[in-house]
Amino acid sequence: MDSNSPVNQITNDPLAAIRIPEFKNLMLGRFTFIMALRMMSTLVAWWVYELTNDPFAIGLVGLSEVIPAISTALYAGHIIDLSEKRKLLLRGVFFYTCAAAILLFFSTSYIGSHFSKLAITIGIYAVIFCSGIVRSFTGPTFSAILASTVPRPYLQNATTWNQGSWLSASVTGHAMGGFLIATIGITNTLITVCSLLVIAFFVLMRLKPKPSLPQSGEKKTWESVTEGLRFVFRTKELLAAFSLDMFAVLFGGAVAMVPVYAKDILKAGPMGFGWLNAAVDIGAIFIVVLLAFFPMKKAQGKKLFLAVAGFGICIILFALSEWFVLSFAALLIAGMLDGVSVVVRGTVMQLKTPDHMRGRVSSVGSMFINSSNELGQFESGMAARLMGVVPSVVFGGCMTLIVVIITWIKAPTLRKFEY
């Protein structure tokens, strides 16, 4: 690739993107929003396991969210590219606030005294299902807005800080979720979640309007909807990066079983659950901040493969551990390696995607990557029921290593990729 091309005109200032006021507003709003959602997901996993005492029930939480998220992802990308993105994002945050408010109502003593545990659990699944539809719009909208807040030479730096903000929020949300469940209970934790979502809404209102960009010619709706998918399949580096991450997360979804490990194997309680749930993200944020100041200069493709392989090994170690400190350390290192994967994949997507297709390509990315988290949660729950909790997590780690080997052989363009 030509060293003078726009892709390679990358700033060496680690704080370049942070100096842009609108980018700071986007990061602050996204931080608050993601922190609230991670608190809610931590709470829901613990709450459902407390109601059912069944690992498979945790898996069904993921399935409840992923079915609508995948089903609507392509159409959501089409709508995002045709819409004013700031308004669309604010609507998504509003609907998430409504979902959290409904969960808050379900947690009250009135509902607990008038409905069975099964009915409450089904109600939780229904709310998560609806939030999956909203998620198919909000996640890609954030990604599409990102590129319009910074100049192109700042994209790698902005992507790194964006992932750092996301991971910091995830760490804080997971840890605070466990801490608040233990100290103030489920209902008051949900009040906190609702408050954070309201704050995120008002912060994101400070963004400038983001109108749709001109599209290349008139297209039928279905043709436009599938254009992002066709673009990803034509762009080999992007397809390989998405596929590698998707299958690694799908089979390496050990975090889905953290409630079981915390409660039944490690005897760590809600507080330990919160820290174990946050361990992967703590590791990831450390490496992402490190990469912001010391970015990878070459061989990013090979480093991506090594990182995902190391992630699989850490998952196996976590599965076999019966000591809290070792379990936390295994997840922490897994998070560091996952952080490398996140930065490389995110940068590849931002650099390879045309501006007028960012919504659709981001939606395809959400189908590949984000939805694999919930599918991995379901796979982990199903495997735990069939094989037992520990063997199922070992199996997931081994499958991650197999995926790395297959992708290494089948995707030489990603293996050789540099930016």
Please place each PLM-identified region on the residue numbering.
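C-terminal transmembrane bundle of multi-pass solute transporters/carriers
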Residues: 61, 71-75, 82, 86-88, ...
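Helix-loop boundary and gating motifs at the non-cytosolic
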Residues: 8-68, 230-280
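Cytoplasm-facing, short amphipathic helices at loop-to-helix transitions on the intracellular side
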Residues: 23, 85, 142-143, 154-156, ...
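Hydrophobic alpha-helical transmembrane segments
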Residues: 99, 118-128, 132, 157-214, ...
